[in-house]
Amino acid sequence: MFLEMIGAMIITFLNLTQTEKDTKMSEDPAITTLIIAATYVAVVGYGESSGVVTGSPYNPAAAMGLFWAILFQSNIDRTEHIWVFFIFSYLGSMLAVLLFECVYKKAMNMSHR
């Protein structure tokens, strides 16, 4: 559960930093895409290196898609523990938004003054 939250937080935070004009690390779209993709690969690698492979998508929208795909296949028994992906992915994403808005952007604005 902790891995889902941390993974979602890291992915969301880096995505926010690379999609906002003032906080981008590079203006080149290829480098921006590389940063976001490398973040996702690193998070998945981190999740698998913990010894517990959860199969978490680390993305709340992907977790929702996974839930609906399983549900439409009429396999409701496999959705018993899907709440872990929903709740902790969303908590991690909300934590990343708070960190980005309340800490990172203010620190970036102070450093640019």
Put a short name on every predicted segment.
Residues M1-R113:
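Membrane-interface helix-loop junctions and terminal tails of multi-pass membrane proteins
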